[in-house]
């Protein structure tokens, strides 16, 4: 794991701040989200705490009960947690949850996470 301040993330200071400000093991930056712009998702939740070998960010857009354009993104393990930087592809609600290599899911108690 090494020095958590080192790595390929040019915003290591921002990852540290996100780590401190996390809510239920998840932080998103920047907010509000803007379609076409990049967003960073930091995950330190249940799957990370249980030692997942790999975590995926499961993303979809639209109403909470009808996700569209659903995609899984492999996250990168850092000293601050699992991180993924991606472009917000849609103007609809940004919905997401997480799963690991053993098909365990963290969906925020069935509510998922979302930003409008």
Regions found by a protein language model. Give the residues of each.
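A structural signal for beta-rich interaction modules in eukaryotic proteins
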Residues: 12, 16-53, 61
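Long, contiguous interaction/targeting segments characteristic
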Residues: 1-11
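Exposed beta-strand face motif in extracellular beta-rich ectodomains
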Residues: 92-96
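Aromatic-rich carbohydrate-binding modules that target alpha-glucans
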Residues: 48-90, 101-116
């Amino acid at each position: 794991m090494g020095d958590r301040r080192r790595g390929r993330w040019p915003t290591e200071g921002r990852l540290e701040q996100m780590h401190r400000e996390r809510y239920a093991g998840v932080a998103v930056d920047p907010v509000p989200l803007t379609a076409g712009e990049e967003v960073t998702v930091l995950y330190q939740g249940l799957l990370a705490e249980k030692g997942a070998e790999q975590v995926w960010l499961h993303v979809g857009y639209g109403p909470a009960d009808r996700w569209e354009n659903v995609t899984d993104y492999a996250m990168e393990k850092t000293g601050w947690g699992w991180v993924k930087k991606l472009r917000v592809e849609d103007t609809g609600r940004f919905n997401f949850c997480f799963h690991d290599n053993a098909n365990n899911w963290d969906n925020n108690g069935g509510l998922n996470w979302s930003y409008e």
